[in-house]
């Protein structure tokens, strides 16, 4: 064993060993308990960032720990390879998306290997591989045959720059999240999958996910948004038109004073026929932002249509307005407004001088003051005719029943969740396997023509998808008839919704999944990924699993038992103001900083001497130029140090602040472990440990060792508080370094401790532990070693240290037998000179005893 810890000498050799021995390759083995650990697959952007490193280190720690417990552990990796960034990069670099993507995969694969992640590389997949997406296409055709897929014209957010549809969440301040172009509304035909058919299952099964973060489950519940209410139909005055609204508060119905409709509603169009101002407003609404997160904060605007709806119970006429906060794709595209009891309706009514009629009493039974704001609490009805005096639930039922009886109402369960639009007008994605015959018949691509392969040798002009620009590509024949292929491609969430299942059988060519392999490995035991995926990816992931189950391909109801959402990685951010006042962000690596005595940054300059503004810690990003290249850190400190810092600096689910001083601290710790091991081995062979002959000090040290094993086992396995596990090993190492090494049993105890420390650190720092295990004479490779077991006997304390107080002041510390009674402790305390002198001539009025810890004698 060399004297100095030099990761550059160790890590590449250990990685080569793993590669040659195929250490992490697994197959199904019914004789062993399986464990499937999965981190969300990366997009091959070209370089790993620290967010990747954190995600994959967490997954690797869990995988290695579970393997040491004797389980058959699957930890695969692959590439979420389709997507818009590849098209932009291809245009910029004058290439095609495919070679750019494959080059990035190769580069990032090598980066992952440098970090020592224990993947089964034989299971690697890239979602742009036709052997992968052929089964996605096949499954889509089966969903179509089951009636779960349909095509309809839909209003979408359209980015005129990227020429693609954007999800509501991708519209920021009315602009495209990627290129900042103003977004337009456009009607185009799109393919949808009926996720709404599974809304109740998706909602109810959240209760079975006991090991998922509550935050994620709450976000999904809100996204599904199940509500019970009533569809109410209004007649339109002077017309045969009908107007239907959905409400969850029929108890407030007698307070409805206007109806608001979406810009795309037929009544809006009708009102605009002879009203140019309304037509202009409708056009403005069509092109306005519709991201739901911004709905609550944006300015509420409206315009009257000139039409009136007739209240079906009171017979009163209420005006119909077009409002920018009503969306055609949600519910019926119309809402009844009760401004006295809904804040949004109140703001709109106040702005435009519409009536506000309270119909629910305040909680104290008084009439509510609705001049300053709406009264939104539920309560007793008044001002509601025959329904006066009813409480919320009775009012809800009575008004709903009356509407149903009159034929103008229908009780209904509604969902916020909308069907999944899977069409994208981009090139770099899996072609949607549908064709249109000459007679207009639309049908799935026949199975024997799958996969519909995306041509990869293309020229990108940055404007039109190559498969849309080339009329020849779309031409095909089905049953001898000419047909045209669909030129839209799948939303890339399609690929990432089932990749976890394909990992169980990536080479299987007889079907989408090998049921035997899939049902051996699934569900995933541990999934690791960011909280930002809570409602999109993780919802589709769960939905797809239920589709696979209903197709007979998997047996389980849910795809993953346990979910860990790691926090973001933050770094210092610096900028200076450019010539036009814009912020020019400077990499932290180039910032020369001065700190105060508490380590806070007080001044920063760039290499040219420009003064920099310190913008604090923020998420590592290209936009703020504050990403830290993992490769640079690995080359400087070694992969084990980077991994250890990532797991120690913060609890896994919290944000992590990147501090190079912390990385240096992790490196120093590994050097200490190496140094202690080296010094121990330099003293020669070690005798077997004889537990029966240990001194009290040796027993105490061994007790600390086995308590640490118990704590680290619980911290990694159950609590997943990896940082506290590492802290416990560090604390133990401090004790080991201070322990005497004079006798044979001192050295035998240190040998036991070091072999345990190496195994406890192995999931975090596998390379150095591999080397130390060999040097210390561990059996076989540490990769196949068993996790250390805490010795219950060793943890039993023969004695306890009890603090003795008199009137609350510490007077002595005494050692007593671990099972000593209170009387024995009091007797022992009375023997102490420092205690006895305070008891002389006084009466003990009260005794406070905390067993094994504290004795407080209150005297007077």
UniProtKB/Swiss-Prot annotation:
Leader sequence segment: none
Keyword RNA-binding: no
Transmembrane segment boundaries: none
GO molecular function: aminoacyl-tRNA deacylase activity; ATP binding; leucine-tRNA ligase activity
Motif window: 'KMSKS' region: 619-623
Class of enzymatic activity (EC top level): ligase
HAMAP family associated with the record: Leu_tRNA_synth_B
Protein name, UniProt field: Leucine--tRNA ligase
